[in-house]
């Protein structure tokens, strides 16, 4: 199940999720909740937390549309990594950063 709060980004968030599920079928195996929140003080655009099969993505609530897409893609890659059991932080970030812009462009070009 995929839940995203915040009316402004619900449709876009669902579109990104559906796009990513076609590439990362593991995403359909877990519950994911996306929560827009002010992350200014944390100096990040987003992060992912895992509890059992529940994955919570907090994403900064004042991003441009493209930054929102890129950040959600990045964090959904982390959810897939959690499902795959990839725990090494350096490898996780290397993979997510290496794919986020390519996947963002693929998503934007399909629209």
Where do the protein language model's features map onto the residues?
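Post-HExxH zinc-binding segment in Zn-dependent metallohydrolases
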Residues: 88-111
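Zn2+-dependent metallopeptidase catalytic core
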Residues: 8-29
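Membrane-anchoring alpha-helices and their flanking helix-loop junctions
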Residues: 38-41, 82, 101
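Hydrophobic (often cysteine-bearing) scaffold residues that line and stabilize catalytic clefts
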Residues: 12, 69, 92
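Catalytic glutamate of the conserved HExxH
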Residues: 71, 75-79, 83
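Hydrophobic or amphipathic, alpha-helical segments that drive membrane association/targeting
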Residues: 2-8, 32-41
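Catalytic zinc-binding patch centered on the HExxH motif and its immediate surroundings
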Residues: 35-56
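Short pre-active-site segment immediately N-terminal to the catalytic Zn-binding motif
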Residues: 53-72, 86-87
